[in-house]
């Protein structure tokens, strides 16, 4: 089903988004870019699509998707000859796989740069794997004869997007089938959305410090060395006269830290740290039960949700202002049902 513009609204299947007078999508949802074929758009070279159920069925209540098909964006029709990446010397070009004449590298690069320059408002991007325009990693690259391909490339659109917006969470549809990668991607888009909201409301040192404080436990679960380094950067915020410049650097460092997948060991350390807050409130049986759940998670016999659920119960019973504000316990809407399987 094709997209259409109707009276200022962008209609895509069951999704409707309001456009403002400049054409930008306005929504209360989190803005996320996506390869159009992943929403079920019949825009692929063969007239098909690669509908991603996770995006369409699970993320859509929370996310305002902004679909792009770079190959149609440069004027190619549907259907069309397949494209592929070709390496000649040190240069990689985008060409038709049926060997017809035509180097699409420059036009695709120009289109990708124009698009990327207007996407700073996005909080994430989901791209189509293996695509010579959109693939994020391990895209096939052929030699000049169309042979000897190696899975070593990146699609031109995604390459430009990631170099222009290096802080932006980008993932492929295939990788999002991995529960931990899926969880990490959702976590990052929510963290960036909240950070962008602070800038929209007017940057202050206090607001940035409060934001960082809310994310401390979550950051600790990702990387202890990077957590400490980012903490030193935040402590030095008073040395920056230009808060916009500070925001740009903080955003890059924060999103780089969150891109590290959290480890079981780091999660265990965070859980044990939080356990210490209830040292005086819990009786012996309760302390033993909590310690047993944390150890069960450490040994992979309990999912992360088990100790977190018990900790949240104790947080409600014995309120602590610092813990109640920590995004570690609620990094995304509970209805997304992440953290359930590990």
Can you name each region flagged by the protein language model?
Residues 1-11, 23-24:
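Positively charged N-terminal leader segments that act as targeting/secretion signals
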Residues 42, 76-77, 133-137, 179-182:
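Short catalytic/ligand-binding loop motif for oxyanion handling, primarily in non-cytosolic enzymes
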Residues 42-43, 47, 51-93:
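N-terminal glycine-rich anion-binding loop in soluble enzyme alpha/beta folds
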Residues 93-111, 121, 147-214:
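Divalent-metal-activated hydrolytic enzyme cores
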Residues 31-38:
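Short, hydrophobic/glycine-enriched beta-strand segments
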Residues 170-342:
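Acidic, Ser/Pro/Thr-rich low-complexity regulatory regions
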Residues 26-27, 54-64, 111-123:
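Short amphipathic alpha-helices and their capping/turn segments at secondary-structure boundaries
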Residues 111-144:
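N-terminal glycine-rich phosphate/adenylate-binding segment common to multiple enzyme folds
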């Amino acid at each position: 089903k094709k997209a259409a513009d109707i009276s200022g609204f962008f209609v895509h299947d069951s999704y409707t988004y309001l456009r403002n007078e400049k054409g930008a999508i306005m929504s209360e949802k989190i803005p996320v870019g996506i390869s159009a074929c992943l929403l079920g758009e019949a825009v692929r070279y063969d007239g098909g699509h690669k509908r991603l159920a996770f995006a369409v069925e699970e993320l859509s209540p929370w996310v305002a998707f902004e679909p792009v098909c770079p190959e149609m964006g440069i004027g190619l029709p549907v259907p069309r000859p397949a494209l592929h990446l070709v390496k000649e010397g040190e240069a990689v070009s985008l060409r038709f796989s049926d060997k017809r004449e035509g180097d699409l590298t420059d036009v695709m690069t120009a289109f990708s740069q124009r698009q990327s320059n207007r996407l700073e408002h996005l909080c994430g991007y989901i791209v189509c794997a293996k695509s010579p325009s959109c693939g994020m990693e391990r895209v096939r690259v052929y030699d000049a004869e169309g042979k000897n391909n190696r899975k070593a490339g990146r699609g031109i659109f995604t390459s430009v997007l990631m170099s222009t917006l290096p802080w932006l969470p980008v993932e492929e549809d295939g990788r999002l089938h991995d529960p931990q990668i899926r969880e990490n991607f959702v976590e990052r888009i929510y963290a960036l959305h909240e950070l962008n909201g602070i800038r929209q409301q007017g940057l202050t040192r206090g607001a940035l410090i409060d934001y960082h404080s809310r994310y401390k436990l979550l950051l600790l679960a990702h990387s202890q060395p990077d957590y400490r380094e980012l903490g030193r950067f935040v402590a030095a915020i008073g040395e920056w006269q230009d808060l916009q410049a500070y925001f740009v650097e903080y955003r890059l460092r924060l999103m780089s830290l969150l891109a590290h997948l959290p480890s079981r060991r780091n999660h265990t350390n965070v859980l044990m740290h939080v356990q210490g807050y209830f040292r005086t409130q819990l009786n012996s049986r309760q302390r033993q039960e909590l310690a047993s759940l944390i150890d069960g998670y450490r040994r992979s016999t309990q999912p992360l949700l088990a100790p977190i659920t018990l900790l949240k119960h104790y947080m409600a019973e014995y309120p602590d202002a610092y813990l109640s504000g920590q995004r570690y316990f609620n990094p995304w809407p509970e209805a997304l049902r992440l953290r359930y399987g590990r």
